[in-house]
Amino acid sequence: AISDIGTCEADPEASYFANVQIPMYLANACKDNNRKLICFSSDQVYSACEDDGSYTEENVKPGNIYAAHKLEMEKRVLDILPSAVMLRAEWMYDYYEKRSNYLMMILNAIHTQDSVSFCSKQFRGITYLKEVAENMDKVILLPGGAYNFGSETTQSIYEVTNKFLDMLGKKLIVKDALARHNLWMDCSKVRKYGVEFSSVIDGLERCARDYKL
């Protein structure tokens, strides 16, 4: 997949091949060989919803090419293979230095004492990658369809960031960014099948404890 929104906007053809056509090839292969298919979709399918959320699986409105391609991928794959599972994943993080994610952004900013910017009005989930891995045995057993998948929150990403810094005992300037659309998912559908995540702030606390941050 190509998950960078800017890259997809700049090259829609490459985005379509990576984010729609390749999953369709996989769906056909799984159909021919009687295999289960799990695809990662994205919370970006809610990026232009008119209400504030939290969003259930039926309430979709993509606001960029990446999101539109992910939603089309879901529909096309499920047409080919109704048993396939589409996981609408959030921004995932872990202690991994080779690729930027929320955790590494905060830790790097603490190290350099650069400021970070998050919107006090934006509600979105972020998910500890370890909890994603821990849930995969249950994901394999899910009925076909689309599922919101990740940690839930009752706080803005700005509030979460300040609480996380307090938890770490670190000082950092957190600027209030311009308003951004919520990516705030209701994950109750998947929870009915035993797929459980910590809340956003509890997931960050667990990650900090795991890595002794």
Language model feature labels by segment:
Residues 10, 18, 64, 124-127, ...:
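Residue-level signal for the nucleotide or nucleotide-sugar donor/cofactor binding architecture
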Residues 62-69, 99, 121, 128:
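The catalytic Tyr-centered alpha-helix of NAD(P)H-dependent dehydrogenases
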Residues 10-13, 17, 21-25, 45-87, ...:
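Catalytic helix-loop patch of NAD(P)-dependent Rossmann-fold dehydrogenases
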Residues 171-173, 177-213:
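C-terminal amphipathic/interface module of NAD(P)-dependent oxidoreductases
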Residues 32-36:
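A short helix->loop->beta-strand "cap" motif at the edges of active sites that frequently abuts
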Residues 1-18, 31:
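NAD(P)H-binding glycine-rich loop region in Rossmannoid oxidoreductase-like domains
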Residues 75-124, 131:
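NAD(P)-dependent short-chain dehydrogenase/reductase
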Residues 133-182, 186-187:
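Mid/C-terminal beta-alpha module of Rossmann-like enzyme folds, strongest
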